[in-house]
Amino acid sequence: MQIFERLGSIQFDPVEPSFGRNAELVLQSRVAGYQPVLLEGLLYQERRLWDGFDKVMCIYPTQDWPNFARRRALMRVHYGGEEHRPMQLAEMVRSELQARGPLSSIDFDHDGRADWFWGETRLVRATLETLFSIGELGIHHRVNTRRIFDLSKNLLPEAVLNALDPFASDEAYQDWHVLRRIGGLGLAQVGSGEHWLGIVGTKSPQRQAALKRLTEAGLVTPVKVTEIPRQTFYARTADLVHLDEMNSCNPTEAAFLAPLDNLLWDRKLIQWIFGFDYIWEVYKPATIRQYGYYVLPVLCGERFVARFEPKFDKKSRRLTVQNWWWEADVTLDQRMQAALARALKDFGTYLNADEIALGAAIENDHSLIGVIGAAKSL
């Protein structure tokens, strides 16, 4: 739970390659010894974590549910009225859930269709998603990509469910959410971008005002980066101690990052500071991809050194380094090889892999042969 307390939330994405969804990939790179059953247990058994909207669809501590009351209220205003077609089935859905327990859209015998955000879908699915967005329903569990819904009152602790909006004003809410988001990012630039999504009622003027209040209160600290003198960044003041800790850390540790890791929420900042341009190409047609379908950035020490396309065969338990693209000017030395070998070994352990191998496209890459060999010897 400590990682959620520090980051606030991690992003959920339903795309599920053989080596795990985004949320699992975030955790495997940040939590030593992480196994997917840990997240599943915290979400759907202990209920200490909750599927809900923050930046977009995210996973966050259940205790934070009251803090998102304004988001749910906004959704109710826009989509919760009787004139909104999916709400025509709301009472039927509530009654069925009350009588039958947790259900997914395929458990309802209703043939109506509706225009929805991404195109036409079943009306009952739109109803479930609307009731979820306004807080009446929660996700009981998932079966692969299918969501099984239940009434929120059956999932949330009573004290959390009945808690009032803790913020007395828009400004108090904005201060909380901006501070939380900075903590999730680690370092934030004030300019508009996807990294500020989901903060209700907060555009550039409100965000600037919140940053000013938080700075005056000593909760955030402006940070200057020598190589980028015209930009001011912000960090949580409580996190600045980690800058000193970095001096005593091993400078050559490596990790394979999730494509939607919090660190990558602001791609512009990553380009400025690390000189690393990353675009997730999962939704691009194969013919126009520069790299691959689901490619993970490779962070080693203080720089991004490569891009990694894994493939995992669940039957044979074989992890294949399907493809690997080194960044320009990267020189593989013994320390980097050892760090990458440890990261690859840890990635295999996360997947319970029995074997690690190179894909056909790179099977003669001597630098990677050395990394694989070192990983196997650990």
What role is predicted for each listed range?
Residues M1-L378:
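Long, charged, low-complexity, helical-prone intrinsically disordered regions
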